[in-house]
Every structure is written in structure tokens, then in C-alpha cells.
């Protein structure tokens, strides 16, 4: 009898943990690759500023775009509470840009992770897909919340800036991969999509039968800038656009979404990061 009661109690406890809501802060951030010609905004001048911003904002998870291997290592050194997963897109190791996922290791464990190439053969390392002009990837991590055991998938990407077929096909591929890896469990897709919300690639994401929602559009509260790309404050304000997004599956509630406005005297990147407060 005592064993039965113990088992029932364990089942109830497990159920209550899985039903418990989890609040997390999740961001996307194109950090601009390490280009010495960006002076005075080269990576060496910005890296501590970027790390301090992340610490101040207390992100639980964030996706990065454009970081090279040295930047990936810098971030890990400057942010000891975070673990990063990802590979360089050119050789699946350290060459080329990463689309890395960073998570606070005090909050989450990574149960699994990987990278696939945005191409007709997602396993073909370094392959350009469709009409793309660059090699493109998506990196994912299956995360488990330490306190509750909840599972959530992080996917982070950087779409091609030219190939419209590649942009649309990348959306379809990522949706398939989310379904394969976590099924109907919560997932968050972040990235620099190199398109606006008027594009076919964007509409493929939000109108597919596997629904992903634009976090900024469904948030209970929004704030900040209306655009993400500003080219180190050089793009005409009238021509700036939002090309970086956070998408969530429907079981995730978006409490707040903000595009952090640039500060001209202390630019973080040529893109503004977007962060979201989520209830999972």
C-alpha cells in the first residue's frame, strides 16, 4: 500500500512539474562578423559591450548570427554562465560563420544539439542550397529546463540574402526539422532572415500548417525600435527594416517583445537585437 501511495505521489509531482509555467527571456542577435574594416565598430571594440549587454538583459537563451570562431570563443570566455553550441558553416567545424545557440547553463541543460545545412541535402557540409549565393545553416538545441523538466527546442538561423527560392525552401526545411526533432513540444525559432514580413519566406513560416507565430506581433507588450538592421547607424532611417525575428509555437505565450534601439555612441552591432519574455 505504501509503495502504491509513493508511486501515485511521484506521478502527481511529475505532472505538476510538467504543467508548471516557465518564464524565460529569449533573444536573437546578429553580432556582425569580425571585420577589421569596421573601425571604429570592429569586434575588438564591441565585444565587451556586447557581453555586458547580455549580462544586463539576463537572457536565458539567445541565438547569434555571423559570429566567427574567434567571436564564438570570446563570447564563451566573457559569458561564463552560458554554454554555446554551433559550428562554422563552411566545414562543420571552425571555418565560416556560426549560427550559434547560447543558453544559461544554470537554467537549462542541452539534451541534444546539431546543425543542418539549408540546402537540398541538409547533411551535406558546406553545401549551398537552391539559388543561394552563400552557404547557410541552422543550429538547434533540445533544451531541458532544470527546475521543471520542461523541454523546449531552440533553432537559430541566418537566411541567404539573395536567393528567394532558398529563403522559402529554408523555411520549409526548418519547419520539417522542428517537427522531426521535438514534434508538438514547444519550439522557438530565431534568426536574421534577410527578409521582411512581406516576403514569401516569412509567410511560409507563419501560414504553414505547422504554425509558428511572430513573437513581436502576438506579444502582450512591445517596445523599442521598429527595425533591426541599421548598418552601424548608416542606413537612412526611412529605409531601415525589421529582418530579424523570433517565432514561437502556439503553446508559448509572449509577454513582451522589444527591439533594443541602437545607441550611436555605443553601437552593439549593425543590427539591433530583439528579445522576448516568454511563458512556456
At which residue positions do the language-model features occur?
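Bacterial Sec-dependent N-terminal signal peptides
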Residues: 1-23
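Acidic/histidine-rich helix-loop elements
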Residues: 28-48, 94, 118-134, 160, ...
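Active-site environment of divalent metal-dependent phosphoester hydrolases
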Residues: 33-36, 67-73, 161-163, 194-202, ...
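Structured beta-strand-rich core segments of catalytic domains in phosphoester-bond hydrolases
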Residues: 61-151
Amino acid at each position: 500500500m505504501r509503495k502504491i501511495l509513493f508511486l501515485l505521489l511521484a506521478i502527481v509531482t511529475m505532472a505538476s512539474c510538467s504543467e508548471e509555467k516557465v518564464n524565460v527571456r529569449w533573444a536573437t542577435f546578429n553580432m556582425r562578423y569580425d571585420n577589421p574594416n569596421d573601425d571604429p565598430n570592429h569586434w575588438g571594440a564591441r565585444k565587451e559591450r556586447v557581453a555586458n549587454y547580455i549580462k544586463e538583459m539576463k537572457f536565458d537563451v539567445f541565438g547569434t548570427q555571423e559570429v566567427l570562431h574567434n567571436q564564438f570563443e570570446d563570447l564563451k570566455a566573457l559569458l561564463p554562465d552560458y554554454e554555446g553550441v554551433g559550428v562554422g558553416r563552411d566545414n562543420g567545424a571552425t571555418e565560416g560563420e556560426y549560427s550559434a545557440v547560447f543558453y544559461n547553463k544554470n537554467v537549462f541543460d542541452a539534451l541534444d544539439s546539431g546543425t543542418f545545412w539549408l540546402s537540398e541535402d541538409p547533411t551535406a557540409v558546406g553545401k549551398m542550397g537552391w539559388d543561394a549565393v552563400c552557404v547557410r545553416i541552422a543550429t538547434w538545441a533540445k533544451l531541458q529546463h532544470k527546475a521543471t523538466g520542461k523541454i523546449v527546442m531552440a533553432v537559430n538561423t541566418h537566411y541567404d540574402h539573395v536567393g528567394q527560392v532558398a529563403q522559402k525552401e529554408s523555411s520549409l526545411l526548418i519547419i520539417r526539422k522542428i517537427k522531426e526533432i521535438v514534434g508538438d513540444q514547444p519550439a522557438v525559432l530565431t534568426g536574421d532572415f534577410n527578409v521582411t514580413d512581406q516576403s514569401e519566406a516569412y509567410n511560409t513560416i507563419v501560414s504553414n500548417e505547422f504554425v509558428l507565430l511572430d513573437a513581436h506581433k502576438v506579444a502582450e507588450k512591445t517596445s523599442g525600435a521598429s527595425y533591426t538592421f541599421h548598418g552601424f547607424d548608416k542606413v537612412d532611417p526611412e529605409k531601415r527594416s525589421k529582418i530579424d525575428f523570433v517565432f514561437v509555437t502556439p503553446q508559448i505565450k509572449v509577454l513582451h517583445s522589444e527591439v533594443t534601439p541602437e545607441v550611436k555612441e555605443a553601437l552593439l552591432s549593425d543590427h539591433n537585437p530583439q528579445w522576448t519574455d516568454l511563458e512556456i
